[in-house]
Amino acid sequence: MANHNSSRHTIILLQNSPSRATRTFMDYDSIGQAMDGICGLYERKLKEINPSLRNISYDIADLYNFIDGLADLSALVYDHSISAYLPYDRQWIKQKAFHHLKRIANGGR
């Protein structure tokens, strides 16, 4: 069977603060795109805090702190073999974000 890892529809469930009104979701065509989206959220926050900076750089620990600071974060990833979405927690998201950023840093996408 073909490897569907790159084309696994991914839904990110996100809650910024303890208020239930901050619950939202984002959907992506792949896990990699979802990780780009999460990194993008953090990068936008950094730009809001530091509007005069042209280039934003950060350490993986900073991204982990951002992820841990969210009231809730989880992912639903489509599994073609069972035709259903499987849930994943923030630890899984942190692991995937790390591998995604490492791949980008090494020049591969």
From Swiss-Prot:
It holds the Pfam family ER. Signal peptide: none annotated. Gene3D superfamilies: Enhancer of rudimentary (3.30.2260.10). Keywords: Cell cycle. InterPro entries: EHR_sf, ERH. May have a role in the cell cycle. Belongs to the E(R) family. Homodimer. This is Enhancer of rudimentary homolog. The lineage of its organism: Eukaryota, Viridiplantae, Streptophyta, Embryophyta, Tracheophyta.
